[in-house]
Design a protein with these regions (language model features):
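STAS-typified acidic loop motif
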Residues: 2-36, 53-55
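Short acidic-hydrophobic, aromatic-tinged amphipathic segments that line or gate anion-handling sites
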Residues: 103-109, 113
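Short, solvent-exposed coil/turn elements at secondary-structure transition points
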Residues: 25, 87, 110-112
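A short, flexible N-terminal coil/short beta segment enriched in small residues
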Residues: 1-2, 70
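Amphipathic alpha-helical interaction surfaces in cytosolic regulatory modules
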Residues: 28-104
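A short, charged, amphipathic alpha-helix used as a generic interaction element across diverse proteins
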Residues: 113-120
């Protein structure tokens, strides 16, 4: 049995950057709930979304699909999508295998995410 289902918290790191910090497991049982939460908390006026997966312990194909969907939606709204996940973690390895870096900026920390927003 895996750890626990995902919990998400939102903060405004700066006026132009909303951070969604996800802890626990992202899978088919909660991806729709996570999708709704992000849709409700990230307005089209925000410049960027930083999805912090530092405390995410597991992600399945439904969670990966969610990240690609978010990337498409944010790109259509000309918003920057950054995913924070430390190197060497299982979640990072999965995301690299799925080439999430082709649709989002993949970084190791929230500070790196903010730098990516500044550079865009």
């Amino acid at each position: 049995m895996r750890d626990r289902l995902a919990e998400v918290g939102f903060t405004e790191a700066r006026a132009d950057a909303i951070v969604a910090s996800v802890s626990g497991d992202i899978d088919g049982s909660n991806a729709a709930e996570l999708r709704r939460a992000v849709a409700e908390r990230v307005p089209s006026t925000a410049r960027s979304l930083i999805m912090d997966l530092t405390q995410t312990t597991y992600i399945d194909s439904t969670g990966i699909e969610l990240l690609f969907e978010l990337a498409r939606r944010l790109s259509a709204r000309r918003q920057i999508f950054t995913v924070v996940v430390p190197k060497g973690t299982g979640v990072r390895k999965v995301l690299e295998l799925c080439d999430i870096g082709s649709v989002a900026v993949l970084v190791e920390s929230q500070d790196d995410g903010l730098e990516a927003v500044d550079a865009a």
